Amino acid sequence: MLDSYQRKIDYMRISITDRCHFQCAYCKSDHPRKLKHQDILSYEQLLLIVDQAIQLGINKFKITGGEPTIRKDYLFFIKELKKREVEVTLTTNGSLFTKKDLDFLKKIGIDGINFSIDTLDLKEYFLLTRQNCLETVLD
């Protein structure tokens, strides 16, 4: 698949949730509108879209949100993507990860994890995110 400039399109960004437990100054709306549960695509629906995208030549999938680790069974979804022998990366704030989650992602062969860490200064981190968990993220 090519864009209007004849560049190959080979990746798709999938936002699996619009929710996030951070309140980042640069991201948060003053009047957030969250989708109702029934309005969010199920993993089965997302996988049908993924299968169609693969047929069109997409071979890289970037999983984002909101904060994707908030969504129940996000690890199942990533595992299902990896079964399709495609490249999968995850973007997260890292605050909800456990060692078990990281071990699982390594075991199934995730291709990359992008951690959103805006500063290494504890005070600045809190001012940006309204969360006091930088040390947890860095661990």
Language model features: what each stretch is:
Residues 4-44, 56:
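Canonical Radical SAM [4Fe-4S] cluster-binding loop centered on the CxxxCxxC motif
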Residues 43, 47-63, 70-139:
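Radical SAM/AdoMet-radical enzyme domain recognition
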Residues 1-2, 12, 37-38, 65-66, ...:
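A generic structural signal for short
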Residues 3, 7, 123-126:
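Flexible, active-site-adjacent loop/turn segments at secondary-structure boundaries
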